[in-house]
């Protein structure tokens, strides 16, 4: 495990990329702290409950790479934001408006990345006009901080390394590049572009689009990811 962590950390440093590994397989704050001590800027979680465990274990910066929906969970998100830097993915105007309303009531600001659908077809915004509209909405809200964008090419993660895999990732990166260009032209300049996984980071890193990579599974499953 230590060798895998060192190998991953060295790779991302060589590419001038921040490392924010996904901990859905890692699970424990103790291992997350080992990774952070080796150079990661924080972790990525799939669920609010995972983020709560990580914060309780002392992790100070967390991206929740899914939408937090419903007033009760948003209230928990607000509470967690008092204890650590929490960023969450968003892709829906109604949810963002609810987040802003509850954040105002709780006297906190919530950090968000807008998720762009770059081929996974599970979540994220597909149409450029919808993406720009959500950027504009967030810009007008007092308690939502726009930090950037997230795009996940997960449909390519399990493919064997081949021209087909590279073509799939290339198509995703082209979608991401176009979306970023359109947003920047309208004055929405991201600090963070998050994405990439253990099955794709070796290719994604060469496109120069991301500021941080979420690869975490390779901490354990080095044989699957050819470290």
Question: What residues fall within each predicted segment?
Answer:
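Active-site-proximal beta-alpha core segment in soluble small-molecule metabolic enzymes
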Residues: 22-159
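A generic secondary-structure signal marking the coil-to-beta-strand transition
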Residues: 19, 110, 209-211
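Glycine-rich phosphate-binding loop signature in dinucleotide/nucleotide-binding domains
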Residues: 15, 106-108, 187
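N-terminal, Lys/Arg-enriched amphipathic/low-complexity engagement segments
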Residues: 1-8, 15
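Short hydrophobic "helix-edge" motifs at membrane interfaces and signal-peptide entry regions
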Residues: 13-15, 206
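Short glycine-rich phosphate-binding loop at a beta-alpha junction
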Residues: 19-24, 192-194
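Active-site loop/helix belt of alpha/beta enzymes
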Residues: 118-227
